Every structure is written in structure tokens, then in C-alpha cells.
Amino acid sequence: MPAATVSFDHTHVISPDPKGTADWYVDRLGGKVERSVTIAGAPQIYVSFGDGAMVIVRGERPGEKAAGKTDLQWGIDHFGMRVTGDFDALCTELRTKDVKFLMEPTVINPTTRICFIEAPDGVSVELLERKD
């Protein structure tokens, strides 16, 4: 048995418009801005979700230059957020807010449905519904 327990804490997103990006997670996915600070010369906004997960959004720091998204890269492809409640109603609401669906809701096994949406700055977010 390990001496420590590891659990997921946050996803960190770098954006040219940190406030707009944080607002997107609040308006589209129901997050809540917990705090907004400046660290190393760049805004950093903490957006929490009901299960304790956090998306931290920050801007470019002085002297940094973001390359932007290019072709497929090794590393993180997307992050997933579990939906509890009415998955279809959430998808309908996201469409009314002009959220781009990268993959429509799809049944991937008898207990799981997923879809992919595009967040600001080309970030891919998987929404999943699991029926236990």
C-alpha cells in the first residue's frame, strides 16, 4: 500500500484572453470563479466545478510567447468532465450558446455516452455521461 494517495486536482490552460476563457467555463459549463490573482505578471483565474475539479486559466507572462496550436502533438489531447443530470438538455443549452461540437453525443458502450466540444483557444473538452 502506497504511503500517499494521489488524486486529480486541476487542468491549467494558458490563454490570450484569460477572463474571456474563464467566463466561457462559467457560462457554458457552470463553473464558478473562486479567485483571480496576478502571478509572475499574468492574470490567473481559478474556476471550480461541483466535484472539486478546477480549471486554472492564465495569460502570457512577460517575456513569454505562445506558439498557438499546430498539428497533432504528443501529450494531453483533451480533458474530460463528467455530466450528472440531463445530458441531452446540457447539449441543447450549449448549442444555444453557439458552442462548437467536435463530436456529437455518441454511445460508446452500454453505460457511457460522450461528446466533444471546443473551448476557447482550441481546447478540446470531453463531456461524458456514465450510468452506473
PLM segments and residue spans:
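Conserved A-loop
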Residues: 12
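Conserved active-site tyrosine of GNAT-family acetyltransferases
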Residues: 21, 25-26, 94, 122
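Short glycine-/small-residue motifs
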Residues: 127
